[in-house]
Amino acid sequence: MDYKQTLNLPDTQFPMRGNLPKREPEILEKWQSMGLYEKMEEAGRTRPNFTLHDGPPYANGHIHIGHALNKILKDIVLKSRRMKGFYAPYVPGWDCHGLPIELMVDKKLGKKKRDMTKVEIRKECRVYADQWVKIQSEEFERLGVMGEWDRPYLTMTHHYEAVTARELARFVEKGGLFKGKKPIHWCSSCVTALAEAEVEYADHKSPSIYVKFPFDGELPAELNDLAGRKLSFVIWTTTPWTIPANLAVCLNPNLPYAVVETGDELLVMAEGLVSGVMQELGLENYRVLKTFEAPIFERKTCRHPFYDRPSLLILGDHVTLEAGTGCVHTAPGHGQDDYVVGLAYGLDVYNPVDNYGRYYEDVEFFGGMKINQANGAVNAKLTEVGALLKESEVSHSYPHCWRCKKPIIFRATEQWFISMEANGLREKALGHINDVNWVPRWGRDRIYNMVENRPDWCISRQRSWGVPITIFYCAKCGEALEDSKVMDYVADLFEEGGSDLWFDKPAKELMPAGTTCPGCGHDEFTKETDILDVWFDSGVSHAAVLDNRDYLSWPADLYLEGSDQHRGWFHSSLLASVGTRELTPYKSVLTHGFVVDGKGKKMSKSVGNVVAPEEVIKKYGAEILRLWVAAQDYRDDIRISNEILQRLSDAYRRIRNTARYILGNLSGFDPSRDMVADDQLLELDRWALAKLEDLAGRVEKAYEDYEFHIIYHAVHNFCSVEMSSFYLDVLKDRLYVSGTDSIARRSAQTAMYRILDCITRLIAPVLSFTAEEIWAFMPGERSESVHLGEFVQFPTSFRDAALEERYDNLLEIRSDVSKALELARNEKVIGHSLDARVLLSAPAGATLELLEKYRDQLASLFIVSQVELVDDLADGLTGENLPDLKVKVEKALGEKCERCWNYATSVGDSAEHPALCHRCVAVLTDR
């Protein structure tokens, strides 16, 4: 007789292979056809709200691996919150204005752009941005990210532009907006001001020069004995091109300075830097003649090296001993510290450089010259006049434009600023930073330091594609009309016709009838031509999105972006909200690191180490990308490589195989009919459910705390160690051999059903496709998608400290027995573990008591045919985990049962089934 037909062997159509690249699009199609996101939304409307506000990526180019990391993290957060009983809508957004898009359109238009109006150029930009919104939307959806893809927020919609204009009006209303001439980051290539967040630092080689500024005037009384001698203050700079803009030399009021004699010359520098500077200048024969305190030279003058004008000696605390000479070349038009200290001394904010990075034509010696080519000419002039002491080259970190990657400059121009001091914006923002939960905690210090030290916010840009700064100027007296009511009127027009109106219509048609200049009464006006910084655009998204969709909450529960956004979107959103509402727009801020290659190196097309999301999806599926996101501690830089993805693919396979094995053994199981009551479950099954409950608690807490890597390790460990290596392995005999409806088998199936049901829900936020696939194969009545369900609640706890402690000890004994079985296998005593009879001995005590309590279950726990407790095993193997345990493995007694493969002395006792053991005969008799 073929006894295989009498066994309860696993049976499932759930595929062994994930074949994710093919299967995932089918699942996406199913979600779309069933309207899954809409059903999730509908089901959650009455629940507590959890709003994650999406930071808008640029609508420009295909998504990269950093985008994938960010969107998947957000999706994991939202899905886990929904499964925890929250209403968690997701409104994706796109940043549609700004330089990245305008430059791409410029490139596309080429020479045609010269003959186009601003409105025509803006229309091209809108078409371009719209095209990339659609492409990126599909790419994000392919990752399994669920949201309102058909109703995103775009910073270029009429409504959004109107809100942006209104938020600017609120700053005007509160007196926070002003126009001034200050040095700002300027890109001569892109011809526009740049925000702090648009500046990247990269290694750059610059000239390094030491220059003499000859003292001109009467020496202080303390140095009278040096009268008549040639005295010069020595400065050091890496920007020779700024020497034509020099107006002062700055000293630290609290540092001692030295007069150094070198031949017939006297050089002034900080005393603490003398030896280093002299070594750098190659001067060995020198001596310090005098030391003095800097204030004795305050407001005295040097001569500019090659212009006939004074260079004022001033004092400033920003001067340090970290580099240079302690005498700082000061050009108020080309540096923030220079500007601030220059204001204190009434210096002109002089800038001799135009928008394109050329000296103005009237700049003596260098007129019309590009500054990046002027360093050599300036050095030559300094040499000619005998002022250059040393010229060399230095490699250092230097600011570059984030778009064109070219070095930028500090340059004073007329710009619009939001004041950090008016209405106490800086102080209020710093205070509110402490109201926010920063994850990780160091995020708080990072943004605090940035806000504490940042200059006024330059919000004007000299480009076409953006929301205009809705300020008018009197055509007669030139005064700016900073009137919030007029600005609100314009915003209402934008609501209907968009901000293109600003560039299309004359000022008269954009203003309320009867508007006159408050200064001179004139009624003719011109319009501001600058547009708003895109960081202001995205910074007001809390007002444009959260305040305008009634199903979202303000402030948001969470902002989640890369760590670069402490100086970007987190920063601009904080200032935009505190400046108008005196509240933060977010309760919590979570940041992740950057994606690097497997060796921890930055990704670069030139190096060839870029990992593209679409390539990963084609090879492994989006699911492995999602698992990669969850498996990493995202707070640091996150590594990715084929090796890492392959390792995760193997881990995924183990999780999938665990699910498949359980599904196979749930064949024919109907939860409504076959579930065993909690108090009827076998002890091993109760232990498994206790471990499940522990896992569920840890995983749910990890979701709540955004510790996703804990989830990956916990679930993977549970599936591969506690389930596959022990529990499911031990269950095989009971599941396959026991009677179909026996309590032993139904108890195991009940536990497995509950385990799979719980785990499928637990992994759904991460392995969204696979969880859905498992869900479709689960027995019993259930919702049409796992994503419409919630995490499992345990109304009756299975946790039992005494039970879990007993099984911890049994597992240690099992580990020692497994080692003994492996030795016996190597010595050819046995082949399979079922060939074995295990002898155990232990002295009186806890171990022996445990063995005696579980005497009848030990064989199934060890997956051997027989276990016998004996008084003494002198030749037994000493346990590694339990040194008082002795283990010996022998060949099992009796014959091998053809049905269960266990050895038993009862095989042959049955005339009807002579090849079976008593247990199998009993099962067949009861059928």
Curated annotation (Swiss-Prot):
Binding site for L-isoleucyl-5'-AMP: 561
Job description of the protein: Catalyzes the attachment of isoleucine to tRNA(Ile). As IleRS can inadvertently accommodate and process structurally similar amino acids such as valine, to avoid such errors it has two additional distinct tRNA(Ile)-dependent editing activities. One activity is designated as 'pretransfer' editing and involves the hydrolysis of activated Val-AMP. The other activity is designated 'posttransfer' editing and involves deacylation of mischarged Val-tRNA(Ile).
Residue span of motif 'HIGH' region: 57-67
Gene: ileS
One GO MF term: tRNA binding
Enzyme Commission no: 6.1.1.5
Cofactor(s) the record lists: Zn(2+)
Full protein name: Isoleucine--tRNA ligase
Domain of life: Bacteria
Claim: Chaperone is one of the keywords in the record: no
Free-text domain note: IleRS has two distinct active sites: one for aminoacylation and one for editing. The misactivated valine is translocated from the active site to the editing site, which sterically excludes the correctly activated isoleucine. The single editing site contains two valyl binding pockets, one specific for each substrate (Val-AMP or Val-tRNA(Ile)).
Species this chain originates from: Syntrophotalea carbinolica (strain DSM 2380 / NBRC 103641 / GraBd1) (Pelobacter carbinolicus)
Any one of the GO BP annotations: isoleucyl-tRNA aminoacylation
